[in-house]
Amino acid sequence: MFTGLIETIGKVAGIKSLSDGKSFRIECRFDSGEYELGESIAVDGVCVTVEEFDEGGFTFSASEETLRRSTLADKRIGHKVHLERALRLGDRLGGHIVQGHVDDVGRVLQLKRKSTGADLVIEIPETLRSYVVEKGSLAVQGVSLTVAAISAGNATLALIPATLQKTYLGDLKSGDGVNLEVDVLAKYVESLLPGRRGGIDEEKLRQWGFG
């Protein structure tokens, strides 16, 4: 489990094709702690397993399914990646619960710079729209963000200066793909409510007594 608070930004240093996926070498340096073989790390929001490591970085493999459902397939040598190690007992949950299981890939529509921060507008895949609500949480490239507004299937997310400083979200351009993971709590709520197969919307929540 992760929090969506990025620890550091790494760089893709090597990519090898495998019979059933790809192997990636990531150059990075965390502020504290050492790697362990088998450790879980979120790479742009994708939970991967450390297979090899040294003081300069680590190596992991991604299956064809993972590549198909995430932006890892588009990574090239030199590209940046957000990195976060899994939560440990006693750690603070500063963002929101992020599993590292990417639900789908969204598309950047616009990055609007403001005097302080920026607004990131993303087209949300139709299959995920019922889970994305105003003031709710959404993980974008592994970063825990709050949805500022929803309009016609698009989500606007406010990027504060600290987020722009600690992530590469400010480098995104129109048309870029981004890994999306919706709030797992929304999935649990849907699974418990009647008529869940039709998804959740504001009208259904009112019918069921919420708000």
For each feature predicted by the language model, list its residue ranges.
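Conserved loop->alpha-helix
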Residues: M1-G211
